[in-house]
Amino acid sequence: MKKNLTNIYLIGLMGAGKTSVGSQLAKLTKRILYDSDKEIEKRTGADIAWIFEMEGEAGFRRREREMIEALCKLDNIILATGGGVVLDEKNRQQISETGVVIYLTASIDTQLKRIGQKGEMRRPLFIKNNSKEKLQQLNEIRKPLYQAMADLVYPTDDLNPRQLATQILVDIKQTYSDL
């Protein structure tokens, strides 16, 4: 089946640069950027931490699956996904079939620095006292799933979001001439 190339999906762990790069991709392509976690918060009127607290991870993942399904039906979007989106097989399938999947990677130290700068220590799966260990654990579980989905992979440790977004677009156009 031919891949639908109208959407660009950014996957990777928290702090990998998905939203920063996505914002630049949206500007360069004049497309709308969606952040799946922010869209869930808008729809529910509650933040992700509250959803995790009240509904548990299973409740959040159900909401995430519904949001991914809705967003994958849109055309010509940039989507910065939540780090755990790859844990659900249906999410992986929908994302893979409806766009180009960009996997952004970063070292654990870079992720910790970025998460700390954004004041995002409140993330539900981010345990402040064991943050480095938690990120390593999440990476071990999710990395094979990210790699299996990825059409293109980019390290973001030395991130200049605009330069990286420009390179991603060049690479997409070289790889997929009909985008």
Swiss-Prot record:
Residues annotated to bind Mg(2+): 19
The record lists ATP as bound by: 15-20, 123
Cofactor (UniProt): Mg(2+)
Q: Where, per UniProt, does this protein localize?
A: Cytoplasm
Q: Name one Pfam family in it.
A: SKI
A cellular component annotation (GO) from this entry: cytosol
- GO MF annotations for this entry? ATP binding; magnesium ion binding; shikimate kinase activity
GO biological process entries: amino acid biosynthetic process; aromatic amino acid family biosynthetic process; chorismate biosynthetic process
Q: What pathway annotation does it carry?
A: Metabolic intermediate biosynthesis; chorismate biosynthesis; chorismate from D-erythrose 4-phosphate and phosphoenolpyruvate: step 5/7
Transit peptide in keyword set: no
The record's listing under Gene3D superfamilies reads: P-loop containing nucleotide triphosphate hydrolases (3.40.50.300)
Binding-site positions, substrate: 37, 61, 83, 142
Q: How is the cofactor bound?
A: Binds 1 Mg(2+) ion per subunit.
Q: What is its EC number?
A: 2.7.1.71
Q: Per UniProt, which keywords does this protein have?
A: Amino-acid biosynthesis, Aromatic amino acid biosynthesis, ATP-binding, Cytoplasm, Kinase, Magnesium, Metal-binding, Nucleotide-binding, Transferase
The catalysed reaction is:
shikimate + ATP = 3-phosphoshikimate + ADP + H(+)
Function of the molecule: Catalyzes the specific phosphorylation of the 3-hydroxyl group of shikimic acid using ATP as a cosubstrate.
Fill in the subunit field for this protein: Monomer.
Matching entries from PANTHER family are given as: SHIKIMATE KINASE, SHIKIMATE KINASE 1, CHLOROPLASTIC
> What's the protein here called?
Shikimate kinase
The scientific name of the source species is Coxiella burnetii (strain RSA 493 / Nine Mile phase I)
